[in-house]
Swiss-Prot record:
It is found in: Virion; Host nucleus; Host extracellular space. It comes from Human immunodeficiency virus type 1 group M subtype B (isolate BH5). InterPro entries: RetroV_VpR/X (IPR000012). Keywords: Activator, AIDS, Apoptosis, Cell cycle, Host G2/M cell cycle arrest by virus, Host nucleus, Host-virus interaction, Ion channel, Ion transport, Modulation of host cell cycle by virus, Phosphoprotein, Transcription, Transcription regulation, Transport, Viral penetration into host nucleus, Virion, Virus entry into host cell. Its main location: virion. Homooligomer, may form homodimer. Interacts with p6-gag region of the Pr55 Gag precursor protein through a (Leu-X-X)4 motif near the C-terminus of the P6gag protein. Interacts with host UNG. May interact with host RAD23A/HHR23A. Interacts with host VPRBP/DCAF1, leading to hijack the CUL4A-RBX1-DDB1-DCAF1/VPRBP complex, mediating ubiquitination of host proteins such as TERT and ZGPAT and arrest of the cell cycle in G2 phase. The keyword Secreted does not apply. Belongs to the HIV-1 VPR protein family. This is Protein Vpr. Residues 1-42 are annotated as: Homooligomerization. The keyword Ubl conjugation does not apply. Signal peptide: none annotated. Phosphorylated on several residues by host. These phosphorylations regulate VPR activity for the nuclear import of the HIV-1 pre-integration complex. The gene is vpr.
Length: 78
């Protein structure tokens, strides 16, 4: 009978800790490429829409990833 493999890898960080670290890295990168007033407005919109929730954190991560991807894609192709 098949058995699930035992967990032999290193312990992973908790999801919420990893998510907050990712958000911090994305914010630091976004500040280097976009005006702070835009980013502040985006943060305000997310907060007004989602409040102080994990859904808001996930939304801002998704939007920052998309913005940075498009920014770099356009920058490299021109």
């Amino acid at each position: 009978m098949e058995q699930a493999p035992e967990d032999q890898g290193p312990q992973r960080k908790p999801h919420n800790e990893w998510t907050l670290e990712l958000l911090e890295e994305l914010k630091n990168e976004a500040v280097r490429h976009f005006p702070r007033i835009w980013l502040h407005g985006l943060g305000q919109h997310i907060y007004e829409t989602y409040g102080d929730t994990w859904a808001g954190v996930e939304a801002i991560i998704r939007i920052l990833q998309q913005l940075l991807f498009i920014h770099f894609q356009n920058w490299v192709s021109t």
